[in-house]
Design a protein with these regions (language model features):
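Catalytic domains of carbohydrate-active enzymes, especially glycoside hydrolases
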Residues: 74-88
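Distinct, well-ordered alpha-helical segments
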Residues: 100-103, 128, 169-174, 197-211, ...
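Active-site-adjacent C-terminal substructures of enzyme catalytic domains
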Residues: 226-276
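Active-site gating/metal-coordination segments in enzymes
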Residues: 85-86, 104-108, 112-189, 241, ...
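Histidine-centered catalytic micro-motifs
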Residues: 17-26, 87, 194-195, 242
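Active-site gating loops and adjacent loop-to-helix segments of metal-dependent hydrolytic enzymes
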Residues: 23-67, 117-135, 246, 255
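Catalytic beta/alpha-barrel core
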Residues: 189-196, 217-225
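Divalent metal-binding segments
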Residues: 46-73, 90-94, 161-169
Length: 276
């Protein structure tokens, strides 16, 4: 079975180490918040703002936009130098996806780029997705998997990141069920987005399996944002893949009670998981 990249299908043997959750070009200004603390005056976006952004991650809209293909290609060069060969770009509609520019980024960087299909959390869904029934959404996903996305000819390598909030909304449940049905029919993996606000991963996995997905074809994402050993153990024992995929996001979501773990804490999670 070939692996679909933005430059066409490749054999699995041609793909080495792969970063499974990346965003190369995206626009998440939908999440921007009015700052409670103004940024330092006259300081441009860059490392000098790191301390401010750690506490005010969503307060500068420019901070949540990845807009430059040249920068994306340059940063992907680090994948090669680290011994990797591919990345999975999980930016979807409503997140600023720019599919047409990904092939050139892949060529310039020498990195295989694979994309996902599906629908993110409800606030990013267009009306025709938010109100559609499961059958309609399933048909849309099957078309993308088999023919390519939105006339680009680019076929997704998997379904994801399928967005769920906490609690999961009705529209998100329909989206999730559609992804499961499309994945079960085609063999595509489903990669989910879990909210940092709560533990919905076990219920999400149950619904995916109920709709026909094999657990070992399901990736439960962002588990390193919500550290609970029993929660992670339950998902692992059910047969799904655990994604600790938010390394580098050491910041607060607007309050001291909404802090992402540090990378050191994430490494402790990995150490614990390996010991289980």
């Amino acid at each position: 079975m070939p692996i679909h990249t933005v430059l066409g299908p490749i054999d699995a043997a041609d793909l080495d180490r792969t970063s499974m959750h990346e965003h190369l070009l995206s626009d998440l200004r939908i999440w921007a918040k009015t700052p409670t603390e103004l940024p330092p005056e006259g300081v441009p976006m860059g490392p000098e703002l790191m301390a401010y952004l750690r506490w005010n991650f969503l307060s500068i809209p420019e901070n949540i936009v990845l807009h430059d293909p040249a920068v994306a290609a340059e940063e992907l060069a680090h994948v090669v130098s680290a011994g990797g060969s591919g990345v999975v770009e999980l930016t979807l509609d409503g997140m600023g996806r720019r599919l047409a520019e990904l092939p050139e980024i892949s060529r310039r960087s020498g990195v295989h780029v694979m994309v996902g299909a599906g629908f993110y959390v409800e606030p990013t869904m267009p009306d025709d997705v938010r109100t559609a029934d499961v059958d309609t959404l399933t048909d849309r996903l099957l078309t993308q998997l088999r023919e390519g996305i939105d006339g680009t000819g680019i076929r997704p390598a998997l379904l994801g990141e399928i967005g769920t909030s906490y609690p999961v909304t009705d529209a998100e449940w329909r989206s999730l069920r559609a992804a499961a049905r499309a994945g079960a029919e085609t063999g595509a993996t489903v990669y989910t987005h879990q909210s940092f606000r709560g533990m919905a991963g076990t219920e999400v996995l149950e619904v995916l399996v109920e709709e026909g997905m094999s657990p070992d074809r399901v990736i439960i994402g962002h588990l390193d944002e919500y550290w609970d050993q029993a929660y992670h153990r339950d998902i692992a024992q059910a047969g799904a893949v655990l994604a600790y995929d938010t390394f580098g996001s050491d910041f607060y979501y607007g309050g001291a009670d909404l802090r992402n773990p540090t990378d050191a804490e994430r490494l402790h999670m990995v150490e614990w998981l390996l010991s289980e």
